[in-house]
Amino acid sequence: MNYTKILQGILDIGEAMLKSGAENFRIEDSLYRMCRSYGFTRYDVFVIPSNIQITIETPDGEILTQIRHIETVSTDFDLLHHLNKLSRYVCAHTPNEKELHQIGRAHV
């Protein structure tokens, strides 16, 4: 499993949530849940209105960190509703890195 790509896909969804006006706490909670569903042994998520940071520890003991700077934010409740459903889908089905990347990139 390519954990870097998985992390990118999770971060893509978080970025789309932040750009759509989701609350920081809701984004953190969604990202925590997605990280947990992939079996990461540790995951730290930090969200502020212009930045998302995620550090994970893989089951192999590798530590990865990715950071995104978000420049534009608006409010789109329809997209947020879709992204929340998408987050639940990811947690329930843990799509592979290719599918997750396609899902996440479709909304960034």
Regions found by a protein language model. Name each.
Residues 1-95:
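Soluble N-terminal domains of membrane-associated systems
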